[in-house]
């Protein structure tokens, strides 16, 4: 993960590739790969099918309508993702990788 930590209005956040111009936005973009098939995750429908096969279920009790959430009955883990797939950044990808070791990998898109 590369970027700059920004502190603004009492909140600290990581801004990935802050000096990157708009012309070459995909050169450093990350993708998540499902290792058993080598498939790049390109939509939430694909991701949800895979997560379900790994024992994850949709969680509707969070109250936040801007999030897709998944939980696993056998653990206390919760995966929270933005509903808009275009906002599915490497932070969310790594969260999934950590909670599903040996099934996913994050790499550069190129």
UniProtKB/Swiss-Prot annotation:
InterPro entries: FPF1 (IPR039274). One of its GO terms (biological process) is regulation of flower development. Modulates the competence to flowering of apical meristems. Belongs to the FPF1 family. This is Flowering-promoting factor 1. The lineage of its organism: Eukaryota, Viridiplantae, Streptophyta, Embryophyta, Tracheophyta.
């Amino acid at each position: 993960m590369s970027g700059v930590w920004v502190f603004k209005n009492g909140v600290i956040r990581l801004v990935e590739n802050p000096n990157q111009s708009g012309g070459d936005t995909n050169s450093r973009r990350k993708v998540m790969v499902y290792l058993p098939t080598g498939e790049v995750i390109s939509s939430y429908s694909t991701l949800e099918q895979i997560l379900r096969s790994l024992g994850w279920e949709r969680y509707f009790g969070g109250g936040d309508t801007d999030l897709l959430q998944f939980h696993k009955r056998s653990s206390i883990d919760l995966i929270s993702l933005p509903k808009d797939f275009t906002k599915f950044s490497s932070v969310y990808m790594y969260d999934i990788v950590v909670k599903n070791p040996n099934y996913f990998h994050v790499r550069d898109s190129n």
